[in-house]
Amino acid sequence: MAQWNQLQQLDTRYLEQLHQLYSDSFPMELRQLLAPWIESQDWAYAASKESHATLVFHNLLGEIDQQYSRFLQESNVLYQHNLRRIKQFLQSRYLEKPMEIARIVARCLWEESRLLQTAATAAQQGGQANHPTAAVVTEKQQMLEQHLQDVRKRVQDLEQKMKVVENLLDDFDFNYKTLKSQGDMQDLNGNNQSVTRQKMQQLEQMLTALDQMRRSIVSELAGLLSAMEYVQKTLTDEELADWKRRQQIACIGGPPNICLDRLENWITSLAESQLQTRQQIKKLEELQQKVSYKGDPIVQHRPMLEERIVELFRNLMKSAFVVERQPCMPMHPDRPLVIKTGVQFTTKVRLLVKFPELNYQLKIKVCIDKDSGDVAALRGSRKFNILGTNTKVMNMEESNNGSLSAEFKHLTLREQRCGNGGRANCDASLIVTEELHLITFETEVYHQGLKIDLETHSLPVVVISNICQMPNAWASILWYNMLTNNPKNVNFFTKPPIGTWDQVAEVLSWQFSSTTKRGLSIEQLTTLAEKLLGPGVNYSGCQITWAKFCKENMAGKGFSFWVWLDNIIDLVKKYILALWNEGYIMGFISKERERAILSTKPPGTCLLRFSESSKEGGVTFTWVEKDISGKTQIQSVEPYTKQQLNNMSFAEIIMGYKIMDATNILVSPLVYLYPDIPKEDAFGKYCRPESQEHPEADPGSAAPYLKTKFICVTPTTCSNTIDLPMSPRTLDSLMQFGNNGEAAEPSAGGQFESLTFDMELTSECATSPM
């Protein structure tokens, strides 16, 4: 069954997470229409190869055109309009950046797969009964639903009682006026007063009953408001706070955030009940004006009840105004909350009170550092202006689910220049990537005679002026959201708190799992812990300072732990993503562990790991071999960097890697990928197939061109491989050699097969720094 069809069969709680994956960057509507085709493409490979990404992107546009033609024949105007709009958007955003849409789609597909796995695991283990956390959450939500239903029922019951009281009051008013009129006539005629006294007693009984019902209604209203206050506190202080914390976690690569639809339904339901209750309290005022008496409970309690319901509704509306999508540059979707000056960023706000009458009524204004002007000057932070479309009206049409929201797509920041280069105080203690800024959203609500000022803030953002500041800026975002749920602590880095290894390890794994299909294993994390904290047995609970994580150089290195790791993450995403997703790259492994696992393997077994000495990120392979005396040798090649991987894929490097011995014989030392996977099975599918066409002859030459092939070679003048140089040296324009170094025989077509070796380094022998 297709993945998309499987997703449609999941429970609501999983479907809510699915909705959260999609946005305007890659509409769910397109995912639905092109599901089979989308799932048949290798988006992960396209995300790492621009040429393939371009091909897939143009094929995507072609698929959209086919769907458009189908809807044109069916005269489906709505889908025609939507597809035309989607295609125009994709062309405007991704035509020059096809790898970006490939990365987005690849991540969505992977998150979908992870969602299916989570659901399957829950089903296999007996559902939520075997998952205490999930069960507690579900039980809490069920209790909340029951409380909301109870509130709605009590509101309706009160509505009926109000009608009974109103009818009783009308009867009392009629009888009272009738008796008064008859009494006046009797006074004029001097008639007997006994009938009048009897009717007066009846009126007194009616008034007593009316008073009892009024007191009952006032008491029930007070109890209802207390129930509303409890439900509201649960919604805002627990459910909404939990969602905001999950949003923080999702921003730094954690599990996808659960969408807001269910929370919106709860809050809207409560808001509707509150407005209905407010109308009931206003009705009490009308009843009071009709009939009032000494000790009237309405006179005593109505003002307080009205004050309470208005305050509850105001607070609910203020809490319901949230940032649904945190500020993010479209070019860096996996690193929200980092904004570069002069570069557009997007963000989205939402009101979780879904009142149709508020559609197109709320104008949102955006500003930055609204409440921190004096603080910014005091601590020397830069100041910025927001440019672009910084006002927008909330509406229900732009969102897929009809929520009341406003998405800002064309915002940019410009620094206010001061005399000292933009810093308000040249003695500022924080570097620019530790400065935190708040983006504020404001609006006013006018509803049923109430004016409510709404304001919400983004999570703190880091503003950079150069993309080279991105790694340190992202480190700040990670550290902040890992250690605090305070949404407005812009002075966080004046005294950054200490994290534990358990917290750091989880976040580090997210940096891989959020952009690839694989997080970090316990063994890989242990290796990273050793680099951060030194040798140890149990790192759980060990403390890590902000400086240790990001600012101080590692022992014996000229760069920090985070700079090194971030460059490896970049290397994985751009150059070796497919191999990482397959689990072929062991990555982080100590040299002792490396030697231990390879020494028991047959010669030619290799593993792939990251360089520990390359600041810019490097990947290498280590293999085992036997010397002429049968002694096991472990060899490593000098790490390949991004610059080298730009010219040749790592899979092709491994498949073609040779050693040239003193007799000029080419030998391939790599046979298996650890533990025992033939290298052809592991890497062959990631190599470009060799062209079967014969090259054309130069018009000025009688003979055809000879084929060329780039491979990496390590030359050695040694008689055996005991002293094999560790660095990859390559030879240029070596002709006449076949796979085993023997003279190539002419082919049937009279051509010679030839190998051209890319010569980048000239030293014949070198010792690896690894």
UniProtKB/Swiss-Prot annotation:
Its main location: cytoplasm. PANTHER family: SIGNAL TRANSDUCER AND ACTIVATOR OF TRANSCRIPTION. Transmembrane segments: none annotated. The modification N-acetylalanine is found at A2. The modification Phosphotyrosine is found at Y640, Y705. The modification Allysine is found at K601, K615, K631, K685. The lineage of its organism: Eukaryota, Metazoa, Chordata, Craniata, Vertebrata. Involved in the gp130-mediated signaling pathway. It comes from the Eukaryota. The gene is STAT3. The modification N6-acetyllysine is found at K49, K87, K601, K615, K631, K685, K707. Residues 580-670 form the SH2 domain. This is Signal transducer and activator of transcription 3. One of its GO terms (cellular component) is cytoplasm.
